[in-house]
Amino acid sequence: MKLTLWTYEGPPHVGAMRVATGMTGMHYVLHAPQGDTYADLLFTMIERRGKRPPVSYTTFQARDLGSDTAELFQSACRDAYERFQPQAIMVGSSCTAELIQDDTGGLADALSLPVPVVHLELPSYQRKENFGADESFLQICRKLARPMERTEKVSCNLLGPTALGFRHRDDILEVTRLLEGMGIAVNAVAPMGASPADIARLGAAHFNVLLYPETGESAARWAEKTLKQPYTKTVPIGVGATRDFVAEVAALAGVAPVADDSRLRQPWWSASVDSTYLTGKRVFLFGDATHVIAAARVARDEMGFEVVGMGCYNREFARPMRAAAKGYGLEALVTDDYLEVEEAIQALAPELILGTQMERHIAKRLGIPCAVISAPVHVQDFPARYSPQMGFEGANVLFDTWIHPLTMGLEEHLLTMFREDFEFHDEAGPSHHGGKAVPASAPRADEAAEALPLTGAETAEGGSIPPEAVPPAEAAEAPAGEIVWLTDAERELKKIPFFVRGKARRNTEKFAAEKGLTRISLETLYEAKAHYAR
C-alpha cells in the first residue's frame, strides 16, 4: 500500500461491496472500523442508486481493540440477519480489520444462521478492487451453484456485471437483446441483479457469456470445469467485436449467426465525408484491460485513428495487455500510478485521450480532448439515458462519445487559415462545446511596436530588427535558470498545429537547456527541430 492522491482501484473489500450491492437478497457483513464505512457514498452519490447498499459494519473503535472484537463481529452478523432477512450473507474484513486477524468465517459459522454464509478472505495488502469483486463472485458461485439439468431452450448466463461498473446496466440490456434476436434465452445475469436463488440455478444454462473478465473470469473458469459450461472469450465492444461475438455465440449454441444491425450507424458515420478529419488522429488509451483492448481495435480499425499509446492499471491482465499492444507496434504501460500515465501522455502528445476519470483530469490540465471508456468514473458517467458500450447500439454511442471532444475538420482548417482571428483562434477551443466565446488575446506591446511603419534606419537593415538588438518586454532579465521565449520564436511556435505544439515547446526548451541557453530565438527553434528530426 502507498499514500497517493488518486487510486484507480480501491482495496479488495470495495470489490466485494460492488458484488453484494449489485445483487438482491444478499447482505455483506464487513468487519471494519468507523473510517472504512464509505459504501453509502460510493453507491448512492456516484452511481445514484435509489437505495442504500446491503452492507453492515462492526464499526469498532480504538477502545474496542482491548476487548473482544470477535463478539462485536458476531453481534453485527446476528443483527444484520434479524433486520434484513437476507437469503445469504457474505462475511469478510476490511484492509484495517485484516490486521486484527479475527476469523470472520469461523465466527459467522458458529452462529448457525439459517442461511448460507460465504466466507471472503481477500488479501488487502497484495490485491485490489477488481480482484476482490472477481474472488467474491467466485466464492458465491462455489457456495451456491450446483450442476443441474439444462433448460429445454438454449440459454446462457451473463457473467461479470457489478454495481459501480462502467455502463454495466445498459450493456446487460443491449447484449440480452442481441442474444434474444438469435433465439437464445438468458437464464441469469450475475452478480448484478441476481439473488442467491438465481446463483443456485446458474447450472441450468448451456453456456456462459463473460462480459467483464476483470470481475467474472474466475467464476466462468470454475463453471467451465464444475458445471461443464463453456464461456465466450470475445467482449462485444465495437462493430467488429460484436460480429465476432455473434459468430462465437452461434457456434456454442448451435444456431445461425444472425443479428439485427438495423440500428447500427457507426460505420457509415465513420466513413462519411464530414468525418474524414478523424483519419490519422493520434490517440492514447488507458483504463482496465478489457475496455482498452476493445477500444484500441475500434479506434484503429473502425474510426481510422492512430493508436500511439495504450495501457492498463490492473496488473492481473498485464500479459494480454502487452500482447495486444504488440499488435500496434507499442509497449504497453502497466501501472497504477497516475503520475506515470501523465508523464507518458505528455511525452506522446496525443490528439485524443480515451481513459478513466483520472485521464479526464490529466487531459484538462494538458488541454487535450478526452473521452471516458473505463472505470473508475465519476457521477456524470452514470447517465440517466440508455448509453451502452457493447453491441451495435454501443458502437453508435462510442462514435458520438469519442468524436464530441474533437475539433471538427472544417474548424481545424479555419484555425489554420485565420489563426489570429477574433473567433477562430487556438485559445477558443472547439465551438460546439458551448460555454462562452473566448476573445483572442490582445497583442503585446512589443508585437504592436513591430507592426508600426519602419524608419529609414530599420529599412536599411532589411526591414527587421534582430531580437538581440532590441529585446522584447518578456525577454528582460529572467530569473536564474528560467528559459524565456523571444517574440519571433513564440510567433513561429503558434504556426505549429495545436495538437503537437506542446511537444514542440517541450523539446525546444529541453534543447535550449542542454545548450545552456536562457533565451529561445527563432534560430534556436529551428535548430531544435533539426536536432529532434534526426
UniProtKB/Swiss-Prot annotation:
Q: Which cofactor does it need?
A: [4Fe-4S] cluster
Q: What note does UniProt attach to the cofactor annotation? A: Binds 1 [4Fe-4S] cluster per heterodimer. The cluster is bound at the heterodimer interface by residues from both subunits.
Q: What class of enzyme is it?
A: oxidoreductase
> Disulphide bridges in this chain?
none
Q: Which UniProt keywords apply?
A: 4Fe-4S, ATP-binding, Bacteriochlorophyll biosynthesis, Chlorophyll biosynthesis, Iron, Iron-sulfur, Metal-binding, Nucleotide-binding, Oxidoreductase, Photosynthesis
What positions does the entry give for [4Fe-4S] cluster binding?
36
Q: What molecular function does GO assign, one term?
A: ATP binding
Family annotation (SUPFAM superfamilies)? Helical backbone' metal receptor
Q: In which pathway does it act?
A: Porphyrin-containing compound metabolism; bacteriochlorophyll biosynthesis (light-independent)
The entry's active site is 274
A Pfam family the protein falls into: PCP_red
Give the EC number: 1.3.7.7
The chemistry this enzyme catalyses reads:
chlorophyllide a + oxidized 2[4Fe-4S]-[ferredoxin] + 2 ADP + 2 phosphate = protochlorophyllide a + reduced 2[4Fe-4S]-[ferredoxin] + 2 ATP + 2 H2O
Name the Gene Ontology biological process terms: light-independent bacteriochlorophyll biosynthetic process; photosynthesis, dark reaction
Summarize where substrate binds, as residue positions.
409-410
Q: Where is this region: Disordered?
A: 426-446
The job of this chain, per UniProt, is described as: Component of the dark-operative protochlorophyllide reductase (DPOR) that uses Mg-ATP and reduced ferredoxin to reduce ring D of protochlorophyllide (Pchlide) to form chlorophyllide a (Chlide). This reaction is light-independent. The NB-protein (BchN-BchB) is the catalytic component of the complex.
Record text on subunit structure and interactions: Protochlorophyllide reductase is composed of three subunits; BchL, BchN and BchB. Forms a heterotetramer of two BchB and two BchN subunits.
Task: List, alphabetically, the NCBIfam families matched.
Answer: DPOR_BchB
Q: Which HAMAP family did the record assign? A: ChlB_BchB (MF_00353)
The record's family statement is:
Belongs to the ChlB/BchB/BchZ family.
Q: What name appears for this protein in its UniProt entry?
A: Light-independent protochlorophyllide reductase subunit B
